[in-house]
Amino acid sequence: MEETFVPFEGIKNDLKGRLMCYKQDWTGGFKAGFRILAPTTYIFFASAIPVISFGEQLERSTDGVLTAVQTLASTAICGMIHSIIGGQPLLILGVAEPTVIMYTFMFNFAKARPELGRDLFLAWSGWVCVWTALMLFVLAICGACSIINRFTRVAGELFGLLIAMLFMQQAIKGLVDEFRIPERENQKLKEFLPSWRFANGMFALVLSFGLLLTGLRSRKARSWRYGTGWLRSLIADYGVPLMVLVWTGVSYIPAGDVPKGIPRRLFSPNPWSPGAYGNWTVVKEMLDVPIVYIIGAFIPASMIAVLYYFDHSVASQLAQQKEFNLRKPSSYHYDLLLLGFLTLMCGLLGVPPSNGVIPQSPMHTKSLATLKYQLLRNRLVATARRSIKTNASLGQLYDNMQEAYHHMQTPLVYQQPQGLKELKESTIQATTFTGNLNAPVDETLFDIEKEIDDLLPVEVKEQRVSNLLQSTMVGGCVAAMPILKMIPTSVLWGYFAFMAIESLPGNQFWERILLLFTAPSRRFKVLEDYHATFVETVPFKTIAMFTLFQTTYLLICFGLTWIPIAGVMFPLMIMFLIPVRQYLLPRFFKGAHLQDLDAAEYEEAPALPFNLAAETEIGSTTSYPGDLEILDEVMTRSRGEFRHTSSPKVTSSSSTPVNNRSLSQVFSPRVSGIRLGQMSPRVVGNSPKPASCGRSPLNQSSSN
């Protein structure tokens, strides 16, 4: 993204670029037909369950002022508006954990002030949203998104681990509360007797750990040996919501003399019940807030503005990674401006604001990449079969596929249809294997399934329909509140723990923490699997010092969230990492080491073959995963980043790609080869090339 700080320049460029493809955003989605429902349903479950969980967390933290009704309504309204008039339709909006934390701090502050109290909390938070919106307007107009790249991996991964800790904290706190008598409840009820409280707590542990373990297991279903491919894909994509249903069903097993309140379930008023819509008229009470608190609302608003600026922009950035080969322009500045209007609207409606969320945004793009792959593959396979039936030559077959590929694209007038060029280059490479390009072709010469898989690049079905549909479905959950209230709260605590653990793989900060606790005699095992490149290029002592710095900073941020009033300042600590990384860390670490430890992209090295004989034997019988499994493996689960496979030079901090560099300039990443660090599987072999077996700093430190 080009840096521009001329007022309104970034917004103007974003609007100009997105308006040119606005019509195509809709027609492309409708042309996909019913196939668009698969990514829509996938991202709906990924959005709805966390929002329901955050609603239960807010209900407890705000004494019932805010519930799942408000979090679902905010997510639905903001999502629908963004999908219609937003810049980047791949970006998913929703109420996020940082917003819940900030609103918890604000409620505790208001509750402790007689001038505000519980009754004026929403009115005061409305003023906070007004100030937040004004600051977001200023940031968008001045082009602040131009410097989002200065938030390096240090800040992003530390923030991610902080959120994981807060998720786990909420899960533990919720489970402990299952053994206690809830506030605002009649303590004389049978279910609150000591014996029944203990029974409720133990049953809550069963439900929570049941969801956690089965949810984690289902995420790896695509690599299972059992079941058909479609069944494994179904479990991998929808296993977590299915497990929520399963364990909710298990919660209804107790019967007979068991009190009705065991286990405890989600509490929220129905949206049509008397008093449930009091939030929507909060704007009438905003003038009742004392002037000193209206001015004072600027302090938490500045923290929320910083938080949204960072979180929203990074979510949009991860949804538009270059490996997705997106054809349409970005819209960082305009989307931040729109977020300001959405925040203002939410404040006036008395609901918590929504912003871009991680990892749902890159998950949305990934699901649409799978859809585009399926659509392209079906069209090209049908074209190839028709060409073979008419005894076409190899050259004619590729010409026909080029034409079919061209019809599948609706490129903008100012963009080049890169797919046509790549098919042409693939054809040239194919002649080295097949001989005469004009020779007759049949299925023994041209393996339709394999050859077309090799030709297809990673592309995304960029459109607005899936985002609009999933937001509408989230809104439908508000009407389904009587059904949602059947979910046990302990299942939601298990889901919080699931989100915490699920966010750790792919976080290099977490991987370094694990490395510090690995016995020196066992560190070589890290090298036997795909691993971060810094493991081979940076001395272990430097890795340890850098990790200790990050851990200390993380604990300071986490400790800050425990301080009643000062806790609202934790986003400022994340922003402070920019000057710390730019000016302070270079004084203590070598630039080359910092470049590897704080790489802009997620880079990893292939496994080092410590047992070459065993590797050869295994490699001769290895079968390769399907494309959907590859897309799961190629992206980190914590932030939805693409993994970049490279073979680092032990003597240098720089890395050289495993594949031929000249090929990387011709071919875009393929679905069937990107995980293996290849650019074109039809030119390069389908197995990763082993890295040099030189001694890495990790080996040297562990051999002592």
Swiss-Prot record:
Subcellular location: Cell membrane; Endosome membrane; Vacuole membrane
Spans within the Cytoplasmic topological domain: 1-35, 97-120, 177-195, 255-289, 359-480, 579-704
Protein's UniProt keywords contain Ion transport: yes
UniProt superkingdom: Eukaryota
Pfam families documented for this protein: HCO3_cotransp
GO cellular component: endosome membrane; plasma membrane; vacuolar membrane
Swiss-Prot/TrEMBL GO biological process terms: borate transmembrane transport; cellular response to boron-containing substance levels; monoatomic anion transport; response to boron-containing substance
Effect of Y405A: Affects polar localization and vacuolar targeting
Sequence intervals crossing the membrane: 36-56, 76-96, 121-141, 156-176, 196-216, 234-254, 290-310, 338-358, 481-501, 558-578
Principal location: membrane
Compositional bias segments (type: Low complexity): 647-664
Extracellular topological intervals: 57-75, 142-155, 217-233, 311-337, 502-557
Recorded topology in the membrane: Multi-pass membrane protein
GO MF annotations, alphabetized: active borate transmembrane transporter activity; solute:inorganic anion antiporter activity
Region (Disordered): 641-704
InterPro entries named in the record: HCO3_transpt-like_TM_dom (IPR011531), HCO3_transpt_euk (IPR003020)
Family: Belongs to the anion exchanger (TC 2.A.31.3) family.
Physiological role: Efflux-type boron (B) transporter for xylem loading, responsive of boron translocation from roots to shoots under boron limitation. Boron is essential for maintaining the integrity of plants cell walls.
Protein name: Boron transporter 1
Organism (species): Arabidopsis thaliana
